[in-house]
């Protein structure tokens, strides 16, 4: 089988597309020339949190992370690491291959952890040993039986950790209050600025991209004077959520945790004028 390029080469965001030079995904055949094309293979994260790195090395920089149950489409395996893309936000990185498993069909009912952390019990009892703690946002497939979900792959989670969770961005962000700042993090165990707002808006069904510059391309620009609670405020390399017109909730390296503080203080430290964007 062969493909013919449809026109001049286009630029595809390398953090979201396998567009070369070594790996080009099959979906880009006709747009990007390649000696061979690869069709990503669907796998799933089997550990509570899994760092996505810039290269196939445990010492490589963390660029994001997968949470338990999130799908990860891989195109290559090298040195015990898999190169792939998260289905949650299309972000590309390398993860430990041994922390992945074959993904089952996605046509079943999926449950999401809505607690800050949910104990994964060895049996359907609150007195059973805890084999892991699953973070907010973890995705679980399984069968509800009484008060517990029997998780596909093993373990049980209490149904109260899967229901009646935050229904808006403010409540979701509040779950992260005091969480450590962690470059590449997306959970209450450690989160960065773009990861925090991504997780907060996700409970409203709003899909934010992973990095601040990519998120800045989304939403609607709003004049600073017209800002309101729920808007996102951007600076170069940073973002936070307005909880009202003058206070910002954000994960930051100044306090090394998630805090809510005066917007004016953040702007003064940033040394740049903020840009406000609205997401509805």
Language-model segments: which ranges?
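Short, structured beta-strand/loop micro-motifs enriched in basic residues and often containing a Trp
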Residues: 47-57, 114-125, 211-219
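Active-site nucleophilic cysteine motif
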Residues: 173, 185-204, 208
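Boundary regions of SH3-family modules and the immediately adjacent low-complexity/disordered segments
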Residues: 1-41, 57, 64, 68-73, ...
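Low-complexity, Gly/Ser/Thr/Pro-rich intrinsically disordered linker/tail segments
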Residues: 269-280
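...with weaker cross-activation on analogous glycine-rich loops/strands in unrelated enzymes
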Residues: 206-264
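A generic structural signal for residues embedded in beta-strands
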Residues: 45, 74, 142, 234-235, ...
């Amino acid at each position: 089988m062969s493909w013919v390029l449809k026109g001049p080469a286009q630029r595809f965001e390398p953090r979201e597309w396998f567009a070369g030079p070594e790996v080009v995904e099959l979906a880009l055949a006709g747009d990007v020339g390649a000696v061979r094309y690869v069709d990503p293979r669907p796998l799933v994260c089997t550990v509570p949190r899994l760092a996505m790195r810039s290269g196939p090395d445990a010492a490589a920089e963390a660029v994001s992370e997968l949470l338990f149950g999130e799908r990860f489409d891989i195109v290559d395996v090298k040195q015990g690491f898999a190169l792939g893309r998260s289905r949650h936000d299309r972000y590309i990185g390398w993860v430990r291959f041994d922390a992945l498993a074959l993904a089952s069909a996605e046509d079943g009912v999926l449950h999401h952890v809505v607690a800050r952390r949910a104990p994964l019990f060895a049996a359907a009892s609150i007195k059973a040993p805890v084999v892991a703690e699953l973070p907010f946002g973890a995705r679980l497939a399984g069968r509800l039986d009484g008060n517990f979900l029997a998780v596909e792959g093993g373990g049980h989670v209490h149904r109260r950790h899967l229901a009646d969770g935050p229904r808006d961005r403010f409540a979701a962000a509040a779950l992260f209050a005091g969480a450590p700042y962690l470059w590449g993090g997306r959970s209450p165990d450690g989160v960065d600025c773009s990861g925090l707002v991504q997780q907060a808006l996700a409970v409203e069904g709003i899909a934010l991209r992973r990095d601040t510059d990519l998120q800045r391309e989304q939403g609607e620009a709003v004049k600073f004077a017209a800002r309101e609670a729920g808007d996102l405020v951007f600076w170069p390399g940073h973002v936070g959520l307005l909880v009202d017109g003058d206070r910002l909730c954000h994960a930051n390296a100044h306090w090394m945790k998630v805090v809510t503080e005066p917007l004016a203080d953040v702007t003064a430290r940033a040394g740049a004028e903020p840009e406000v964007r609205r997401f509805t």
